[in-house]
Amino acid sequence: MINKKNNLLTKKKPIANKSNKYAIRKFTVGTASIVIGATLLFGLGHNEAKAEENSVQDVKDSNTDDELSDSNDQSSDEEKNDVINNNQSINTDDNNQIIKKEETNNYDGIEKRSEDRTESTTNVDENEATFLQKTPQDNTHLTEEEVKESSSVESSNSSIDTAQQPSHTTINREESVQTSDNVEDSHVSDFANSKIKESNTESGKEENTIEQPNKVKEDSTTSQPSGYTNIDEKISNQDELLNLPINEYENKARPLSTTSAQPSIKRVTVNQLAAEQGSNVNHLIKVTDQSITEGYDDSEGVIKAHDAENLIYDVTFEVDDKVKSGDTMTVDIDKNTVPSDLTDSFTIPKIKDNSGEIIATGTYDNKNKQITYTFTDYVDKYENIKAHLKLTSYIDKSKVPNNNTKLDVEYKTALSSVNKTITVEYQRPNENRTANLQSMFTNIDTKNHTVEQTIYINPLRYSAKETNVNISGNGDEGSTIIDDSTIIKVYKVGDNQNLPDSNRIYDYSEYEDVTNDDYAQLGNNNDVNINFGNIDSPYIIKVISKYDPNKDDYTTIQQTVTMQTTINEYTGEFRTASYDNTIAFSTSSGQGQGDLPPEKTYKIGDYVWEDVDKDGIQNTNDNEKPLSNVLVTLTYPDGTSKSVRTDEDGKYQFDGLKNGLTYKITFETPEGYTPTLKHSGTNPALDSEGNSVWVTINGQDDMTIDSGFYQTPKYSLGNYVWYDTNKDGIQGDDEKGISGVKVTLKDENGNIISTTTTDENGKYQFDNLNSGNYIVHFDKPSGMTQTTTDSGDDDEQDADGEEVHVTITDHDDFSIDNGYYDDESDSDSDSDSDSDSDSDSDSDSDSDSDSDSDSDSDSDSDSDSDSDSDSDSDSDSDSDSDSDSDSDSDSDSDSDSDSDSDSDSDSDSDSDSDSDSDSDSDSDSDSDSDSDSDSDSDSDSDSDSDSDSDSDSDSDSDSDSDSDSDSDSDSDSDSDSDSDSDSDSDSDSDSDSDSDSDSDSDSDSDSDSDSVSDSDSDSDSDSGSDSDSDSDSDSDNDSDLGNSSDKSTKDKLPDTGANEDYGSKGTLLGTLFAGLGALLLGKRRKNRKNKN
């Protein structure tokens, strides 16, 4: 049997009275592309033609002059020569046969003629219609379903004729060439021409030449055509013309794919929501590129809706690997557009890869202007899916009825949208004096094989005399059937009603139905005539006629409407304006019988293995094994790609690849592995191709594309942090490690990889490291100093410093060490002092004191003493003491002392005391003493002091001192002392003292004293001391001394209570207690302040 394919084709032959034939509007029904054209035809009265035929004189009547003026004004703007190339490719899903058709119409030598009719043809394929276009399969792979424009489209051509000067028109046409390559391409270049022509007086028919015959309008100049019935504007509502029913012609399905001349029907019904399965995964769809372009000239921003200009939406997107079979995504077209211009049902393109595998199928929701795609198990088999979608859509004339409407159109895939601003432009009526009309095909029903034509008669509201309308199905390249089954309805437009510029009526009930059988008569030549008579209102004619798609010579649907009005009732002069509306189908069959064989496709594979011996050749080691789950990606020539993973045997495979094309295969390196050597040995079936390779199909499968990997070795880094006691920067045998030191490992960019601390032996280690560059950082331990770095010649024994840059190349590195030693001095002293000193001191002392004293005392004393003493003291003491005193005393004493003492003592004391005292003393002492002291003091001191003091003192001192001291002090002090000493001592003493004191003392004293004294002393002392003192003291002194005494007594010690110096001794004891009380009082006050 012979399976016919409906393919795009334009029939080419010399045609009389035709010029500027071109495709205007296209849509796709199944594999049928439909383009609608409109041809305007203007006729002239016989008298004008005859005058021109018989004479060359330029004679015109006044009416004709007016006519030419109007006509030539239009012609200057609209007359053009047009060349159209229509390239259309159709895909048949059922058998995967791709048919390509290219059409080129060239129009030359257009001259003036008597009746110039320009036709537009539209070619229709009846294969599956899709939005998603594919480029011709000339070894170019796209993950793209280019949209086959699943809409009927329409445009118009118009020309106006006046009969004044003879002319002829020559049209040269090139036959279109039909091919049956594997192509899924569908696009059309359509436009409209509007011309005004003068009538020819002669014409002839030649090959590639069209001339207007002189007889065309001979019998239509002096009288109206026979069979017309005159009617006036007053037309009452009548029943449907011809009283014939018609099947519903709206919302019908159209063929999607076919292998015979009588196609089967697949359809998508609009207003039916997609049955969603799985989850909506719009959030997992990544749009990488999208754009909106105009069908003709994208730079002008104008959509010529009556010229079949469409909007093209291109989007490229990636599908996340998380998407599963049954999940859905959405694509939204603009709310002011429709996928099809003439049909109410259409197919939604499947999203396929370049090998033909279906990624997703779609359904359309007309209410929401949304396509819902459901993913197949393709997404479960492949990864890194990239797709390209190309959709075409047309202006929805129900949404945009008016000319020059500005729109901001928006298209959206998943969550990403794109916008474009356009202006919608509609054609204007064709007029020739009072003859004016506008016509378009507005619907095609491919199931019932009917077309609907909407005609505006007198839309410009002229006063048109003797108006006649002829509707003819006699197209030169195809015809409709005008017979008893044709439905014609006539509607009158009221004075306050407007006709939509879109030439599309959606609700005829708004207009007055004036259909009348009496004024419409069927002709004898597949036509019908309607006589309107004299009118000045617009009318709408709706014509529903049939076509026969099974006729052997059937190629187009063509229907012509002509309006004729009388200009001069006396001469019979008239004017005509015509439209030819055309939908062109072309059929083609495969070579011979049956379907065209599918194009042969090929495979690429095959193996990924673990190359244990790293030689780049398979099977050279018994331990080598396949690697599973390795990601392998195939990239098509257009940049789209898909990925699979190797199975448990290390195998992978890509199918459906085209011969002669070059593909890229990429292997992802598994974690923990390194690519082995590539192109080793002489056998390409056993070597490794590395990470990526380009493969060209040369008429056979290529199952030699393999890749090998070996496990990447891991390395360690360390090693040691030690206590460098000799500070030489080199590890010594007796030097120990330092534990707890923080060590940080970073990459070469400073990003932290890991941290650790040294163990009890000072060791640390980082493992599982690849070859590369690293940074090791040591945190310096508190109280220690970085030792010398890079000392000596042994890198494993020296210190490398705080931060070390390390390069690991196929080996461990245990030479990264560092050393530290203790700080020499760390002194932190905080002292705030304000002193004013004026002193005059001459001191020479040599003190030798040997005392060993251990005192442990805990005393809490609260005393209230009243002492009245008069003492006279004469003492000679020799003291040898060794004392070690650690005292914390708190004294609370309240003493009132009045003493007068006279003491004469000679004491020899050798004491060994161990004292630990804790005393709390609060004393209030009132002392009245009278002492007379004569002392001579020489002081020479050599002191070694280690003190920890924090002193905050405010002292006012008047001293003059001359001191000779040798002091070696190592102090680390942090001390904060606040001493508040308030001492009020009123001393009135009269003492006579003669003392000779020889003291040899070696004392270690740690004291904290707070002393406030106001004393008036006159002394001269001679003292020799050598003391080693560690003291923390706060002192606030106000002293005034001016005395010089030197006494020596040797009197015998008196009996207790019987000595004549008793008064003096009492005074001395009272003074001693008073001083002690003052000291303890100051200490207590200081302690209280510290506690506060």
Curated annotation (Swiss-Prot):
CC per GO annotation: extracellular region
Basic and acidic residues composition-biased segments: 50-63, 99-119, 141-151, 195-220, 802-814
Swiss-Prot/TrEMBL keywords: Calcium, Cell wall, Metal-binding, Peptidoglycan-anchor, Repeat, Secreted, Signal, Virulence
Bilayer topology term: Peptidoglycan-anchor
Keyword Signal: yes
Polar residues bias (residue ranges): 120-140, 160-170
Record region (Interaction with human fibrinogen): 579-590
Binding-site list for Ca(2+): E294, S299, V302, E309
Acidic residues compositional bias, start-end: 64-76, 791-801, 820-1039
Location of this chain's protein in the cell: Secreted, Cell wall
Pfam families found in the cross-reference section: Big_8, Gram_pos_anchor, SdrD_B, SdrG_C_C, YSIRK_signal
Domain CNA-B: 600-713, 714-824
Annotated region described as Disordered, given as residue ranges: 50-236, 780-1068
Entry keyword annotation includes Secreted: yes
Chief place of localization: secreted
Motif (LPXTG sorting signal): 1053-1057
Signal peptide: 1-51
Region (Ligand binding A region): 52-599
Superkingdom: Bacteria
Residue numbers carrying Pentaglycyl murein peptidoglycan amidated threonine: T1056
A GO molecular-function annotation: metal ion binding
UniProt miscellaneous comment: The addition of calcium stimulates the interaction between fbe and fibrinogen, but this effect could be due to calcium binding to fibrinogen rather than to fbe.
Family: Belongs to the serine-aspartate repeat-containing protein (SDr) family.
NCBIfam families listed in its UniProt record: YSIRK_signal
Function of the protein: Promotes bacterial attachment to both soluble and immobilized forms of fibrinogen in a dose-dependent manner. This binding occurs through the beta-chain of human fibrinogen. Could contribute to the initiation of foreign-body infection by allowing bacteria to adhere to biomaterial surfaces that have become coated with host proteins after implantation. Is important in the pathogenesis of central venous catheter (CVC)-associated infection model.
Protein name: Fibrinogen-binding protein
